[in-house]
Amino acid sequence: MYQRMLRCGAELGSPGGGGGGGGGGGAGGRLALLWIVPLTLSGLLGVAWGASSLGAHHIHHFHGSSKHHSVPIAIYRSPASLRGGHAGTTYIFSKGGGQITYKWPPNDRPSTRADRLAIGFSTVQKEAVLVRVDSSSGLGDYLELHIHQGKIGVKFNVGTDDIAIEESNAIINDGKYHVVRFTRSGGNATLQVDSWPVIERYPAGNNDNERLAIARQRIPYRLGRVVDEWLLDKGRQLTIFNSQATIIIGGKEQGQPFQGQLSGLYYNGLKVLNMAAENDANIAIVGNVRLVGEVPSSMTTESTATAMQSEMSTSIMETTTTLATSTARRGKPPTKEPISQTTDDILVASAECPSDDEDIDPCEPSSGGLANPTRAGGREPYPGSAEVIRESSSTTGMVVGIVAAAALCILILLYAMYKYRNRDEGSYHVDESRNYISNSAQSNGAVVKEKQPSSAKSSNKNKKNKDKEYYV
């Protein structure tokens, strides 16, 4: 390819046919070489830059059951601090009960198709309500994390019927520290306690949600409520938790006050206990509730190791991003060093809802972000923590490199054309005239040289003739 371009440059550079082809070909070859080499180098530079940028932006995918593909899940993984045994901000709910209430602003109440909840706790109660999320007045949607007969369970309703899921094998009212993780995707739900297997719940009438969601997009907006009512009459499971208004922690309002320790609550990206410790304006605290500066005393290195094994063996639902590996993923054994208090870092999630199937409020993703675990006192983050970078930015380096290479090549080509067009044409004409004169002289000389023998012969002949006449 390179040699072919050089030959083309040589042909373009030759002024005439065969006589001036040598000098013109050399100039054309040099001209082609002048812009081909920078073009190649610029292209390689752009590709290398784009490849390096592409390699720096990576996203991990963890897939669970295939039944959860109806909704894209933002994140559901235990962060590094929980895997290492750090409980986060901790509150003690004493005898008589207390309550921490978070209220969304009236104009910022989210409606979600997927919810994520995680919390650490220790208690000896057989009956209590830990966390409850309620929708606006009159809607009736709710989600409740509770203890019933010493077992942890979740009950929720998003417009159809109450759906319950419970871990019946784990006893959690033993005074030890436990971590519970709950996810909801439409009417589907999963629940996990510590390192126990994940419990999954798929209610009836929820198998055709994907097809119904596609069909729902083609239904005119004015007919949305009619279609929803018809689907509801047919027993279809609704999926959106509409207009979430309050998060109630402690269960005092429900008549089953919690007594014990609650740590590091996360709900759809909200670090509620951390916000309470910072005296957030949207949070109210009543009753016998106090903030403590250390993790639950009942937590031991054995429970830490259990949580680490749970993280390494568990993959809950489909995810599109994750935190970086921690000491547990690297296989380091649990240490017996004293554990310092950290910020809430059990779970950060962002519930998403690509399409709405209920005509009450437009579905809006909750305002949540991904938080990196930090050491106590606001020092540097734990080793292994990483920022989440979206996949859409992974091609930025490639595009910038290609554009820069193309611009550089165009500039070089324009400069070469400018130099080629403005070179000294007088010298070319002088050289051409000289060649022409010399060629003419040479050709005339050749003709003269060729004719000299014939003229000599004629003179000799005349001389002989004269001699003959003279002698005769």
Curated annotation (Swiss-Prot):
GO cellular component: axonal growth cone; cell surface; endocytic vesicle; endoplasmic reticulum; GABA-ergic synapse; glutamatergic synapse; neuromuscular junction; neuronal cell body
Glycosylation sites: N188, S350
Residues involved in Ca(2+) binding: D141, V158, I240, N242
Residues on Cytoplasmic side: 418-472
Signal sequence coordinates: 1-50
PTMs per UniProt: O-glycosylated; contains heparan sulfate. Heparan sulfate attachment is required for synapse development by mediating interactions with neuroligins.
Superkingdom classification of source: Eukaryota
Main location: membrane
Subcellular location: Presynaptic cell membrane
Pfam short name (any one): Laminin_G_2
Sequence positions bearing Phosphoserine: S454, S455, S458
GO biological process, one term: presynaptic membrane assembly
Domain Laminin G-like, chain residue ranges per copy: 91-289
Protein name, per record: Neurexin-1-beta
